[in-house]
Protein backbone atom coordinates (compact mmCIF):
# COMPACT_ATOMS: atom_id res chain seq x y z
CA UNK A 1 0.00 0.00 0.00
CA UNK A 2 1.33 3.43 -0.83
CA UNK A 3 0.34 7.03 -1.27
CA UNK A 4 0.97 7.72 -4.95
CA UNK A 5 -0.09 11.36 -5.03
CA UNK A 6 -1.25 14.24 -2.92
CA UNK A 7 -3.01 17.49 -3.81
CA UNK A 8 -4.07 20.42 -1.70
CA UNK A 9 -5.25 23.99 -1.84
CA UNK A 10 -7.11 26.75 -0.05
CA UNK A 11 -9.29 29.68 -1.02
CA UNK A 12 -11.26 32.48 0.53
CA UNK A 13 -13.95 32.14 -2.14
CA UNK A 14 -17.34 31.43 -0.60
CA UNK A 15 -18.62 29.42 -3.54
CA UNK A 16 -17.25 27.13 -6.22
CA UNK A 17 -15.07 24.08 -6.51
CA UNK A 18 -11.95 25.58 -8.10
CA UNK A 19 -9.75 24.46 -5.21
CA UNK A 20 -10.97 20.86 -5.55
CA UNK A 21 -10.28 20.98 -9.30
CA UNK A 22 -6.73 22.27 -8.68
CA UNK A 23 -6.07 19.74 -5.90
CA UNK A 24 -7.26 16.89 -8.14
CA UNK A 25 -5.01 18.02 -11.00
CA UNK A 26 -2.02 18.14 -8.65
CA UNK A 27 -2.93 14.72 -7.28
CA UNK A 28 -3.27 13.05 -10.69
CA UNK A 29 -0.02 14.60 -11.90
CA UNK A 30 1.93 13.36 -8.87
CA UNK A 31 0.37 9.90 -9.06
CA UNK A 32 0.87 9.60 -12.80
CA UNK A 33 -2.75 8.46 -12.95
CA UNK A 34 -6.07 9.85 -14.10
CA UNK A 35 -9.62 9.90 -12.75
CA UNK A 36 -10.59 6.97 -14.98
CA UNK A 37 -8.16 4.82 -12.97
CA UNK A 38 -9.88 5.34 -9.60
CA UNK A 39 -11.68 2.20 -8.38
CA UNK A 40 -13.07 3.55 -5.12
CA UNK A 41 -13.45 7.07 -3.75
CA UNK A 42 -14.40 8.62 -0.44
CA UNK A 43 -15.31 12.25 -1.01
CA UNK A 44 -16.47 15.07 1.24
CA UNK A 45 -20.23 14.95 0.77
CA UNK A 46 -21.44 17.48 3.31
CA UNK A 47 -24.54 17.76 1.11
CA UNK A 48 -26.01 15.81 -1.78
CA UNK A 49 -25.22 18.71 -4.10
CA UNK A 50 -21.57 18.69 -2.98
CA UNK A 51 -21.27 15.06 -4.01
CA UNK A 52 -22.63 15.74 -7.49
CA UNK A 53 -20.43 18.79 -8.06
CA UNK A 54 -17.37 16.93 -6.80
CA UNK A 55 -17.88 14.18 -9.40
CA UNK A 56 -17.19 16.89 -11.95
CA UNK A 57 -14.44 18.66 -9.97
CA UNK A 58 -12.51 15.41 -9.49
CA UNK A 59 -12.79 14.57 -13.19
CA UNK A 60 -15.09 11.56 -12.89
CA UNK A 61 -17.39 13.10 -15.51
CA UNK A 62 -17.48 16.23 -17.70
CA UNK A 63 -18.94 19.42 -16.27
CA UNK A 64 -22.72 19.33 -16.33
CA UNK A 65 -23.01 15.54 -16.52
CA UNK A 66 -22.98 14.38 -12.88
CA UNK A 67 -26.69 13.60 -13.10
CA UNK A 68 -26.03 11.21 -16.00
CA UNK A 69 -23.20 9.54 -14.08
CA UNK A 70 -25.65 8.79 -11.26
CA UNK A 71 -28.49 7.75 -13.58
CA UNK A 72 -26.13 5.33 -15.36
CA UNK A 73 -25.03 3.84 -12.03
CA UNK A 74 -21.38 4.70 -12.67
CA UNK A 75 -20.89 5.90 -9.08
CA UNK A 76 -21.74 2.63 -7.36
CA UNK A 77 -21.10 -1.12 -7.41
CA UNK A 78 -21.12 -2.40 -10.99
CA UNK A 79 -20.28 1.05 -12.38
CA UNK A 80 -16.99 2.68 -13.35
CA UNK A 81 -16.10 3.49 -9.73
CA UNK A 82 -17.66 3.20 -6.30
CA UNK A 83 -18.10 6.49 -4.43
CA UNK A 84 -18.51 6.61 -0.66
CA UNK A 85 -19.00 2.90 0.04
CA UNK A 86 -18.95 3.87 3.73
CA UNK A 87 -22.15 5.81 3.17
CA UNK A 88 -20.24 9.08 3.11
CA UNK A 89 -19.96 11.82 5.68
CA UNK A 90 -23.71 12.32 5.78
CA UNK A 91 -24.21 8.78 7.11
CA UNK A 92 -21.15 8.90 9.38
CA UNK A 93 -22.32 12.02 11.19
CA UNK A 94 -19.74 14.30 9.55
CA UNK A 95 -17.56 14.22 12.66
CA UNK A 96 -15.23 17.24 12.63
CA UNK A 97 -11.54 16.31 12.61
CA UNK A 98 -12.33 12.58 12.44
CA UNK A 99 -13.93 12.30 9.01
CA UNK A 100 -10.63 12.35 7.10
CA UNK A 101 -9.26 9.49 9.17
CA UNK A 102 -12.51 7.54 8.73
CA UNK A 103 -12.21 7.98 4.94
CA UNK A 104 -8.59 6.81 5.00
CA UNK A 105 -9.45 3.69 7.00
CA UNK A 106 -12.34 2.86 4.65
CA UNK A 107 -10.15 3.13 1.56
CA UNK A 108 -7.28 1.11 3.04
CA UNK A 109 -9.75 -1.65 3.94
CA UNK A 110 -10.88 -1.80 0.30
CA UNK A 111 -7.30 -1.93 -0.98
CA UNK A 112 -6.49 -4.71 1.51
CA UNK A 113 -9.63 -6.64 0.60
CA UNK A 114 -10.96 -6.44 4.16
CA UNK A 115 -14.03 -4.20 3.73
CA UNK A 116 -16.51 -7.04 4.19
CA UNK A 117 -19.90 -6.59 2.50
CA UNK A 118 -18.86 -3.13 1.26
CA UNK A 119 -15.80 -4.53 -0.55
CA UNK A 120 -15.12 -3.11 -4.01
CA UNK A 121 -13.96 -6.11 -6.06
CA UNK A 122 -10.30 -6.03 -7.08
CA UNK A 123 -9.78 -2.47 -5.81
CA UNK A 124 -6.18 -1.43 -6.48
CA UNK A 125 -6.58 2.36 -6.52
CA UNK A 126 -8.44 4.79 -4.29
CA UNK A 127 -8.98 8.54 -4.02
CA UNK A 128 -9.73 10.50 -0.86
CA UNK A 129 -11.14 14.06 -1.00
CA UNK A 130 -11.51 16.09 2.17
CA UNK A 131 -12.70 19.67 2.60
CA UNK A 132 -12.02 21.67 5.74
CA UNK A 133 -13.29 24.95 7.06
CA UNK A 134 -12.44 28.10 5.12
CA UNK A 135 -12.08 26.34 1.76
CA UNK A 136 -9.16 24.02 2.46
CA UNK A 137 -9.00 20.86 0.35
CA UNK A 138 -6.78 17.79 0.57
CA UNK A 139 -6.79 14.93 -1.94
CA UNK A 140 -4.84 11.68 -1.65
CA UNK A 141 -4.34 8.87 -4.19
CA UNK A 142 -3.71 5.42 -2.70
CA UNK A 143 -2.63 2.33 -4.61
CA UNK A 144 -1.49 -1.20 -4.00
CA UNK A 145 0.75 -3.32 -6.13
Question: What is the predicted function of each stretch?
Answer:
Residues 1-26, 74-86, 90-92, 119-125, ...:
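Condensing-enzyme catalytic core mediating Claisen C-C bond formation in acyl metabolism
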Residues 21-22, 26, 36, 45-53, ...:
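Feature representing long, continuous alpha-helical segments
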Residues 47-56, 84-145:
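Conserved beta-strand-centric core segments of catalytic alpha/beta enzyme folds
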Residues 37-40, 125:
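Residues at the N-termini of beta-strands
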Residues 17-31, 106-112:
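Short, well-ordered amphipathic alpha-helical segments that serve as non-catalytic structural scaffolds
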Amino acid sequence: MQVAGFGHGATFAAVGYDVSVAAARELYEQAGRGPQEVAVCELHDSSTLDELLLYEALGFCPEGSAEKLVEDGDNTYGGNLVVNPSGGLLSLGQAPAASGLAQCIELVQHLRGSAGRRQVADARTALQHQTGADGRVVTTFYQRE
